[in-house]
Amino acid sequence: MDLLMRSDKLKNVHSDIRGPVFVEATRMRKEGIDVLRLNTGNPATFGFEMPDSVRNALINNADKAVPYCDLKGMPEARESICSYHKGKGFKDITPEDVFIGNGVSELVTMALTTLLNYGDEILVPSPDYSLWTNSVYIAGAKPVHYICDEQANWYPDLDDIKSKITPKTRAIVLINPNNPTGALYPRELLEKLVQIARENNLVIFSDEIYDRLVMDELEHVSTATLAPDLLVITMNGLSKSHIICGFRCGWMVLSGAKEAAKDFAAGLVQLCAMRLCANALPQLVIPAALADPESTRAMIVPGGRLYEQREATCRELDKIEGITYVKNSAAFYIFPKLDIKKFNITDDQQFAMDYLHSKHVMIIPGRGFSWNEPDHFRIVMLPKPEVLAKAMRDLGDFLSDYWQQV
């Protein structure tokens, strides 16, 4: 038989989080080399534990997950999600506006597949979380990347966004809090972004999965609360805030111009029906998890692990000549900048590979986040503070005489 080749729809799809550097690190680990994995946001692998509220809800209700559930998700779970978002200021939403999925990843792909036609364009941030760019490609559309400005706390560049809107632009993606930068967008900025969407009749996708991991007593503002006249699709879930990445527990909420989006919503129902239902077991913990904000808050205040891990990382980064960064306000990521002239860096993947081979620490190069210059990389700040501090000291030692060989 002829060779079977992958679809052209996958031509531009990439996942550097589990890309070449990950593959090489996996090979090294199989050979018995201890590799510190700062590549993926998977808290449980670094000693974080799910809250007792989640564990007890799972154990006490497991039998309820045996049959298929509603194709949009269990009613009790959708009711608790609806109440959570109403508490954040959402107006005129009901449990029928909530769709539960096998993680936000599944829902992003479903929503973009439902919305986009071949040739459509959608505005996606650069840097971004690659799921968004990849899902646009899989839907047959074109991601158009707008710049988030490092000199302005990694906030979206409004002029750049305006310059990239065309008659083919259907929607804009906002990742707030942001992955990979850890930026948190203030209300005033969100109002301006919403106004751009309003003036250009754009759907807004607002990825807010890190909204419960905001530090320094800052406020997270949900985009939907500022756009009651627009269709806003808000993505959220429990993977990070409640340490259950493997459960694949995410949801999306449709708000605003729902009347105009009836056919779109019907399309989402079609795709939900195709997979019968999302995994029922993790849905059982949603009400208990959302009723237990303190278990998350304990991690993000002074003395909490996420807070102290950030502080340890930044203290050591401050000591490295040739690296600058913007301190994250949320989540557990930071996206430092390298002085590429100082280190002769032309290939960020090669830099990450060299660091891996030298110090046995795995990071993800900026290219994995739709960043076109070879001058950034993402650090996942999940190991304990002393481990992160050593990794950053190792980075400084590595860079002290680094000169990339071309």
Give the ranges of each region predicted by the language model:
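Conserved core segment of the aminotransferase class I/II
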Residues: 55, 228-304, 314-316, 399
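PLP-dependent enzyme catalytic core of the Aspartate aminotransferase-like
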Residues: 87, 162-163, 344-346, 354-363, ...
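N-terminal small-domain helix-loop-helix segment of the aminotransferase-like
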Residues: 2-103, 110, 289-292, 401-406
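Helix C-cap/helix->beta junction micro-motif
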Residues: 31, 139, 199-200, 230, ...
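Conserved glycine-rich beta-strand-loop-beta hairpin in the small C-terminal domain of fold type I
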Residues: 287, 303-314, 325-339, 373
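Active-site phosphate-binding strand-loop segment of PLP-dependent enzymes
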Residues: 144, 149-220
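Conserved PLP-anchoring active-site segment centered on the Schiff-base-forming lysine
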Residues: 114-136
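Generic structural signal for small/hydrophobic residues in well-ordered secondary structure
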Residues: 21, 38, 58, 81, ...
